């Protein structure tokens, strides 16, 4: 990976609020570093980050991947020409409003394995990271993308859980896989949506910073009303959590 981009991957079990936290991190980065080049990647086929950031999705990575595959297989153009055109379209498709660029993985039309799009996503992360100062990736729930080395060039890995044992087990599994396959420099743990004063477990990784984020009524209302993270009040729990995450990761 070229350059010194900080690539932050937000991972965890589905339903723990990682997409909202990823959006909060993007908002805080735009505020802390207004002159920096920031890229948000929605790597979850559910496409929740686009909604959370109110980002326009012109095309998705899967749209471009399909055209590359078709062009190469049908030999419509020289392979290098196709790849060069794909790179140009990738840069052109990125929404760069609100102080950040945005790319979505998309949802493959065919059912079954996401191997092809995950492989393409890995290459895209490697290519784009050198052109940005900060990259925030909202990963697919679970370990699939980590296991397929989509995240192998991530520099900062954030593990998000709630107060449940299942959420804890998922981030423990993600860390086990990431320790073998991801070249991360810093690791952080965020316990999100805390509704009780006592968390039923301590920091599972004593060497990693541990951020506690209380349940956020403002963010819940925001979601119900279909508003973006940029419409949340400055002092809400979600944005306090995003600040804590960036501080914990040394960003």
Predicted segments with their positions:
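Conserved catalytic-core segment of NTP-binding enzymes
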Residues: 31-34, 116-221
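C-terminal boundary of histidine-terminating zinc-finger modules
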Residues: 223-236
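N-terminal phosphate/diphosphate-binding loop that engages ATP/GTP or pyrophosphate donors
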Residues: 28-96
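Cytosolic-facing regulatory segments adjacent to core modules
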Residues: 83-97, 101-137
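Hydrophobic positions on the alpha1 helix immediately C-terminal to the Walker A/P-loop
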Residues: 21
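Walker A (P-loop) phosphate-binding loop of P-loop NTPases
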Residues: 15
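Conserved lysine of the Walker
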Residues: 18
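Hydrophobic anchor at the beta1->P-loop junction of P-loop NTPases
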Residues: 10
């Amino acid at each position: 990976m070229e350059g010194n981009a900080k690539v932050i991957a937000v991972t965890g079990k589905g339903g723990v609020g990682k997409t909202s936290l990823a959006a909060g991190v993007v908002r805080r980065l735009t505020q802390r570093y207004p002159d920096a080049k920031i890229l948000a990647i929605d790597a979850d086929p559910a496409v929740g980050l686009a909604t959370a950031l109110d980002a326009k999705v012109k095309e998705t990575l899967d749209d471009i991947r399909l055209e590359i595959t078709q062009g190469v297989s049908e030999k419509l153009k020289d392979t290098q020409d196709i790849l060069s055109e794909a790179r140009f379209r990738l840069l052109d498709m990125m929404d760069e409003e609100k102080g950040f660029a945005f790319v979505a993985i998309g949802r493959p039309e065919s059912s079954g394995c996401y191997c092809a799009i995950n492989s393409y996503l890995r290459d895209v992360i490697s290519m784009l990271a050198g052109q940005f100062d900060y990259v925030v990736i909202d990963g697919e729930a679970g370990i699939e993308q980590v296991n397929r080395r989509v995240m192998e060039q991530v520099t900062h890995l954030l593990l998000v859980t709630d107060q449940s044992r299942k959420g804890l087990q998922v981030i423990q599994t993600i860390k086990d896989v990431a320790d073998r396959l991801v070249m991360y420099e810093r690791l952080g743990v965020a316990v999100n949506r805390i509704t009780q004063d006592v968390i039923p477990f301590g920091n599972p990784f004593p060497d990693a910073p541990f951020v506690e984020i209380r349940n956020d009524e403002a963010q819940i209302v925001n979601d119900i009303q279909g508003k973006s993270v940029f419409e949340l009040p400055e002092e809400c729990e979600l944005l306090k959590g995003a600040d804590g995450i960036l501080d914990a990761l040394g960003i």
